[in-house]
């Protein structure tokens, strides 16, 4: 009755939430949705008896203006994670290969396996914790259909440069799709980092992926967007679940896009606190809303911080700590000092 290979597919594990503890394990923002988004959600709720616009025409139009693309180059989904899944399904058949950095977004190997594809993880560079772009190129075979790049990378917070990306793309076969995952784009202050809206204009095999879950504070309503070659976008739409993006999510996203100044102010606070947290915990520079502590002992560190009311994310390769606002940073620092100097 059930696919035999499902037993071997890992289950996605979300960040822990321990009661009243400070949750710094899921890269959520501390502030609520923008006021305009809250108002839009409230208004849209009165029409919740009707199906949402399956084509998200208004939202795609606003996104087109925001991104300087055409609506035909854009699709929306139930978070960028759903769009990653659609991209795998649109490009891969059983036995095809999906290359991605590792450690990176935890769901990449899951998406590949669910589609019957082979997951090909390429370890991060040990000295920088960045993408091993050369190693990813070396891993390409005649079965490779898709490569995910995560920029900034989750959980390391590292980025690659425009020059590195261009050199990479020059060697990627034209029939291999590159998904440029920019879930943390709004927190990225690296001046030499590639931007997917520009990349998709140069490369028909590049798809940009972004979300409203992080900087926009809409993780609970689930809405993201992808953009690129209309042919690829159309293929992604073919494998989408109908009516996946609710009317509330579409309304909230439109309102959020129209409040860019407020968003910038909020992300600047995160950037300021990011430097503060990195200095206290000894983390390398990050371009996302978290910092990364590579190495062993992450589970022990997470356990000790939890005893002091702070929840972080422990991976086998290291610990990730979400960065939010000044008040929560103060609380994190108190717990950190209690663990290390108490």
From Swiss-Prot:
It catalyses: an aromatic L-alpha-amino acid + 2-oxoglutarate = an aromatic oxo-acid + L-glutamate. Its cofactor is pyridoxal 5'-phosphate. The modification N6-(pyridoxal phosphate)lysine is found at residue 214. PROSITE patterns: AA_TRANSFER_CLASS_2 (PS00599). Keywords: Aminotransferase, Pyridoxal phosphate, Transferase. Gene3D superfamilies: Aspartate Aminotransferase, domain 1 (3.90.1150.10), Type I PLP-dependent aspartate aminotransferase-like (Major domain) (3.40.640.10). The keyword Transferase applies. Aminotransferase that catalyzes the conversion of aromatic amino acids and 2-oxoglutarate into corresponding aromatic oxo acids and L-glutamate. Belongs to the class-II pyridoxal-phosphate-dependent aminotransferase family. Homodimer. This is Aromatic amino acid aminotransferase.
């Amino acid at each position: 009755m059930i696919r035999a290979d499902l037993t071997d597919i890992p289950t996605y594990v979300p960040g822990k939430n321990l009661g009243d503890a400070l949750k710094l394990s899921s890269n959520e923002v501390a502030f609520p949705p923008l006021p305009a988004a809250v108002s839009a959600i409230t208004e849209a709720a009165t029409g919740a008896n009707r199906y949402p616009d399956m084509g998200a025409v208004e939202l795609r139009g606003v996104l087109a203006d925001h991104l300087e693309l055409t609506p035909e180059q854009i699709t929306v989904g139930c978070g960028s994670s759903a769009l990653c899944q659609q991209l795998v399904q649109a490009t891969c058949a059983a036995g095809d290969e999906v290359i991605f950095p590792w450690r990176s977004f935890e769901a990449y190997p899951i998406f590949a396996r669910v589609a019957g594809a082979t997951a090909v993880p390429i370890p991060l560079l040990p000295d920088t914790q960045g993408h091993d772009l050369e190693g990813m190129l070396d891993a390409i075979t005649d079965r490779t259909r898709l490569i995910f790049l995560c920029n900034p990378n989750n959980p390391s917070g590292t980025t690659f440069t425009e020059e590195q990306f261009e050199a990479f793309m020059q060697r990627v076969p034209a029939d291999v799709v590159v998904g440029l995952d920019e879930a943390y784009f709004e927190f990225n202050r690296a001046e030499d980092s590639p931007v997917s809206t520009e990349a998709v204009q140069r490369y028909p095999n590049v798809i940009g992926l972004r979300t409203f879950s992080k900087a926009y504070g809409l993780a609970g309503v689930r809405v993201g967007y992808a953009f690129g070659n209309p042919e690829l976008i159309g293929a992604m739409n073919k494998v989408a679940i109908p009516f996946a993006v609710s009317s509330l999510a579409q309304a909230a996203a439109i309102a959020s896009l129209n409040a860019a100044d407020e968003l910038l102010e909020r992300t600047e606070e995160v950037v300021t606190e990011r430097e503060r947290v990195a200095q206290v915990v000894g983390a390398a520079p990050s371009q996302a809303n978290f910092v990364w502590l590579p190495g062993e002992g992450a589970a022990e560190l997470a356990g000790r911080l939890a005893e002091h009311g702070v929840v972080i994310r422990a991976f086998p390769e290291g610990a990730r700590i979400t960065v939010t606002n000044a008040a929560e940073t103060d609380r994190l620092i108190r717990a950190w000092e209690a663990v290390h100097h108490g």
